[in-house]
From Swiss-Prot:
Biased composition, class Basic residues, residue ranges: 255-268
GO cellular component, one term: cytosolic large ribosomal subunit
Residue ranges with Basic and acidic residues bias: 271-281
Quaternary data: Component of the large ribosomal subunit (LSU). Part of a LSU subcomplex, the 5S RNP which is composed of the 5S RNA, RPL5 and RPL11.
Entry keyword set: Cytoplasm, Nucleus, Ribonucleoprotein, Ribosomal protein, RNA-binding, rRNA-binding
Entry function: Component of the ribosome, a large ribonucleoprotein complex responsible for the synthesis of proteins in the cell. The small ribosomal subunit (SSU) binds messenger RNAs (mRNAs) and translates the encoded message by selecting cognate aminoacyl-transfer RNA (tRNA) molecules. The large subunit (LSU) contains the ribosomal catalytic site termed the peptidyl transferase center (PTC), which catalyzes the formation of peptide bonds, thereby polymerizing the amino acids delivered by tRNAs into a polypeptide chain.
The encoding gene: rpl5-a
Disulfide bonds: none
Name recorded for this polypeptide: Large ribosomal subunit protein uL18A
Location in the cell: Cytoplasm; Nucleus, Nucleolus
Gene Ontology MF term list: 5S rRNA binding; structural constituent of ribosome
A single GO BP: translation
């Protein structure tokens, strides 16, 4: 078939159908969303849960959600900006922070449903493959599916750090080791030790040491916040170990106390009838006094 020119006549515009708003904005991949949202027909009203992971310039957002016609319902959420509470005040968007955020989400969700004592997850972090299995006589493991959005799912992406944190925290999420740091595509082998290094930010610590030796000015510029908070390369692993323990001990979100805002008024309040009459009387008296002065 040869080239056919699209004739944009009245019929073309009359029958033209625009794409979904979030597709037009380039925010949602509906091909992927359809498969993440539609539940098996034999499961009736059971929601299909998704673990949503989004990485912004200064934060990492992790949520557990399910779809309804009215919109997505968020069951639980955790953010990287909560990590300073657990002792991590720097590097809130690296792979190690993504792992901590995923772990916080999992522990918070299981605590909400009263399953935190049943499904402890993997307390000893090895970086190796781990899958949560349902325990007989207990409620089944909480199952959800990773929603990476429009993120390019390359090996070593931070999205998979959050996934690993959630799995180690006790959630059942189908996955393989092919996208974790430490997987070699040529030899088809996975090295859990490399993955463990990334979970404890040892790759960052190694770079800190290297930069300190080679160019101290560049080190001071790149790791200014680490220096400000007194974090050295040797302290990084212990920092994350303490954070993991702290998250497991108390994952509950604490609401900030509501601030009492004193309302400011930007326009004049309406005068009552008595005030209006008084105002008129004052103006009259003022006018009469001025007249008397003028006459005298």
């Amino acid at each position: 078939m040869g080239f056919v020119k699209v004739v944009k006549n009245k019929a073309y515009f009359k029958r033209y159908q625009v794409k979904f708003r979030r597709r037009r904005e380039g925010k949602t991949d509906y091909y992927a969303r359809k498969r993440l949202v539609i539940q098996d027909k034999n499961k009736y009203n059971t929601p299909k849960y998704r673990m949503i992971v989004r990485v912004t310039n200064r934060d990492i957002i992790c949520q557990i959600a399910y779809a309804r016609i009215e919109g997505d319902m968020i069951v639980c959420a955790a953010y990287a900006h909560e990590l300073p509470k657990y002792g991590i005040k720097v590097g809130l968007t690296n792979y190690a922070a993504a792992y901590c955020t995923g772990l916080l989400l999992a522990r918070r969700l299981l605590n909400k449903f009263g399953l935190d004592k049943v499904y402890e997850g993997q307390v000893e972090v090895t970086g190796d493959e781990y899958n949560v299995e349902s325990i007989d006589g207990e409620p089944g493991a909480f199952t959800c599916y990773l929603d990476a959005g429009l993120t390019r799912t390359t090996t070593g992406n931070k999205v998979f750090g959050a996934l690993k944190g959630a799995v180690d925290g006790g959630l059942s999420i189908p996955h393989s080791t092919k996208r974790f740091p430490g997987y070699d595509s040529e030899s088809k082998e996975f090295n859990p030790e490399v993955h463990r290094k990334h979970i404890f930010a040892q790759n960052v610590a190694e770079y800190m040491r290297l930069l300190m030796e080679e160019d101290e000015d560049a080190y001071k510029k790149q790791f200014s916040q680490y220096i400000k908070n007194g974090v050295t390369a040797d302290q990084v692993e212990d920092l994350y170990k303490k954070a993991h323990a702290g998250i497991r001990e108390n994952p509950v979100h604490e609401k900030k106390p509501k601030k009492e805002v004193k309302k400011k008024r930007w326009n004049r309040a309406k005068l009552s009838l008595e005030q209006k009459k008084d105002r008129v009387a004052q103006k009259k008296a003022s006018f009469l006094r001025a007249q008397e002065k003028a006459d005298s």
